[in-house]
């Protein structure tokens, strides 16, 4: 509520939200994806990336294979490639968090350096509708 009272704006998806900061339209971005910010900073944008002192949620990007995949061998080979040295280095160079703990990022915070919140998933699901309605109400007030 305090952020909304301070003129919170919801400019759009990740790229649009970050551009609002880099163009000076707004002074901060809350809850953006960090890899876009690291990329922009590497390109010379005058921004910094901060994680909340109390922790944040890290959203993993899993790879899955359908039980009904028509070419199971190729699907497994692709997932194996995703975790290969080559692919994990590409992930790190794209400012994403590698899926393997032995691959480190030189140009961003590594997973072990980011304090993570341990969500209470049951509580979150039980309160999801009410929380979503409140966030939508706050966002609508400033972006209406």
Language model feature labels by segment:
Residues 78:
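Substrate/cofactor-recognition hotspot
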Residues 34-38, 54-57, 70, 84-85:
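Solvent-exposed loop/turn segments at secondary-structure junctions
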Residues 22, 41-43, 56-58, 69-73:
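Extracellular/periplasmic catalytic domains that process cell-envelope and extracellular macromolecules
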Residues 82-105:
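Periplasmic-binding protein-like
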Residues 17, 36, 71-75, 87, ...:
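Stable alpha-helical elements in mature extracytoplasmic
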Residues 59-71, 90-91:
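A bilobed periplasmic-binding-protein/Venus flytrap-type ligand-binding module shared by bacterial periplasmic
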Residues 107-144:
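Extracellular/periplasmic bilobal clamshell ligand-binding domains
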Residues 1-52:
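Ligand-binding pocket segment of bilobal, Venus flytrap-like solute-binding proteins
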